[in-house]
A protein has these predicted regions:
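Short hydrophobic faces within alpha-helices
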Residues: 8, 33, 50, 113-120, ...
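Interhelical loop and adjacent transmembrane-helix boundary motif
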Residues: 1-3, 152, 159-184
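Transmembrane alpha-helices
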Residues: 50, 54, 92, 99-102, ...
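Generic alpha-helical transmembrane segments of integral inner-membrane proteins
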Residues: 12, 16, 20-28, 54, ...
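Membrane-embedded alpha-helices of multi-pass transport/permease systems
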Residues: 24-28, 61, 85, 92-114, ...
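Transmembrane-helix boundary motif in ABC transporter permease subunits
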Residues: 17-48, 111-113, 124-131
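Periplasmic/extracellular loop-to-transmembrane helix junction in inner-membrane transport proteins
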Residues: 1-20, 36, 179-183
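Membrane-interfacial helix termini and adjacent extracytoplasmic/periplasmic loops
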Residues: 2-5, 36, 40-44, 57-92, ...
Length: 184
C-alpha cells in the first residue's frame, strides 16, 4: 500500500479540494443562516447538516445511480467514474463539520462591525474581505482541518465510487490490501 505513492497523493489532493469546498460553502451558508432574513435559511441549514444523518454507503449508491447514466464530454466514461465525484462526496459528507466551526465563530462576531463598515460606505465584498474573513480565520482553519482529517479516513462512500486503482485514495487502498491474503 505504501510502496505506491499515488494513493497518498490522491488522498491529499481529494481531501484538500473537498476541505476547501467545505469551508467556502460553510462560510456562505453560515452567513446566510446567521446574518440574513432570507426565507428558508433554516431549511438550508438543515439540508447542509443532513449529510450526518445519511450513511456514506447510501450516499455512494445514490451518486452512482444518479451520475452513472451521464457521460463525460471528453470520453465515453460515465460521470460517476470521474475522480472529482469522490471529491464531491467527501465535501458533502464533511460539510457539517466545517459549517458548525463557521457558525461558532460567526456567532461571536458582532453585527455592529459589519453595520459600522456599511455605514461608512464599504461594499459587501469589502466587508467580507477585510472584516469577516480575517476575524473568522480561526474557525475557517478549524473547519478545514476537521473536514480534511475526517475525509482522509472516509471509506463507506468512496468505496462505491472508485473506478480504477489509479484514482483510489489511501483508505480504499488499505481496505483492498486487507482483503488479500498478504493483508490478513
Amino acid at each position: 500500500v505504501f510502496e505506491n505513492s499515488v494513493f497518498i497523493k490522491n488522498t491529499l489532493l481529494y481531501c484538500s479540494i473537498a476541505a476547501f469546498i467545505d469551508i467556502v460553502l460553510a462560510f456562505f451558508i453560515s452567513y446566510i443562516v446567521l446574518r440574513t432574513k432570507i426565507i428558508g435559511r433554516q431549511l438550508l441549514d438543515y439540508v447542509a447538516m443532513s449529510a450526518l444523518a445519511i450513511p456514506g454507503l447510501v450516499l455512494g449508491i445514490g451518486y452512482l445511480r444518479t451520475f452513472y447514466s451521464f457521460n463525460l464530454p471528453w470520453n465515453d466514461k460515465p460521470l460517476a467514474s470521474w475522480w472529482f465525484m469522490i471529491v464531491i462526496i467527501l465535501a458533502v459528507r464533511r460539510l457539517p463539520y466545517a459549517l458548525r466551526a463557521c457558525n461558532a465563530v460567526l456567532m461571536q462576531i458582532s453585527k455592529y462591525l459589519e453595520e459600522s463598515a456599511e455605514s461608512l460606505g464599504a461594499q459587501k465584498t469589502t466587508i467580507f474581505r477585510k472584516i469577516l474573513i480575517p476575524l473568522m480565520m480561526g474557525g475557517l482553519l478549524a473547519g478545514f482541518i476537521t473536514s480534511f482529517s475526517t475525509a482522509t479516513v472516509e471509506l463507506s462512500a468512496t468505496i462505491m465510487l472508485v473506478s480504477t486503482e489509479s484514482d483510489a485514495p489511501l483508505a480504499y487502498a488499505i481496505y483492498s490490501y486487507m482483503q488479500t491474503a498478504a493483508g490478513r
